[in-house]
A protein has these predicted regions:
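Active-site-proximal helix-loop-helix substrate-binding element of RNase H-like nuclease domains
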Residues: 18-21, 25-170
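Entry/capping segment at the start of metal-dependent catalytic domains
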Residues: 1-18
Length: 176
């Protein structure tokens, strides 16, 4: 997202300031990134991607997995995308598994539970080359430098959910 002021005034979707610049999705065995509003082209047709995503989110029988769903779903709402299925948030599920953790960020959870981490090397190198902050200015980079990172984000979230789901069942926490 392009979300100026998030650290000082909160998420832009509430203030109607900012926009979604790309959509990362993952299913078992595949992940993809659809750039729609990066400052530096090329981007895909925003309306075409939005229509496709709206259709994908219209299935009531599908579980939609997020890490920090409150944020992502808030931005999807600004695109008139309504998720019809069940929303599952790994940021909520992780403390159910271990409420004594100090941090629940995606990278740390992936490292601890999946023994993997997202590679930010390419993203950081590209940001440095462009003179940008790799996270705050991600939207200014061409999608070719962001896509792999965004795809990893979606894929790791899905794998983390598979792990947490087993833990929740194994600890008999399903009804919590």
């Amino acid at each position: 997202t392009r979300d100026p002021g998030i650290k000082t005034t909160g998420p832009g979707y509430i203030r109607k300031h900012g926009e979604v610049v790309g959509i990362a999705v993952a299913v078992d065995g595949w992940e993809g990134y659809y750039p729609i509003a990066h400052e530096t082209p090329p981007n895909m047709d925003k309306e075409l991607v939005t229509r496709w995503l709206r259709k994908q989110c219209s299935y009531e029988s599908v579980n939609y997995i997020f890490h920090n769903a409150f944020y992502d779903v808030g931005w999807l709402t600004t695109m008139d995308i309504d998720i019809k299925g069940k929303i599952i948030d790994t940021l909520i599920a992780a403390p159910i598994v271990d409420e004594n953790r100090f941090r629940f960020d995606l990278n740390l959870l992936a490292k601890d539970y999946l023994k993997e981490s997202k590679s930010e090397t390419q993203l950081r190198e590209a940001a440095k080359m462009w003179g940008l902050d790799p996270k705050a200015d991600l939207w200014k980079l061409p999608a070719s430098h962001v896509g792999e990172y965004a795809e990893q984000d979606a894929a790791v979230t899905l794998r983390l959910w598979h792990h947490l789901k087993k833990e929740i069942a194994g600890q008999n926490l399903i009804n919590i």
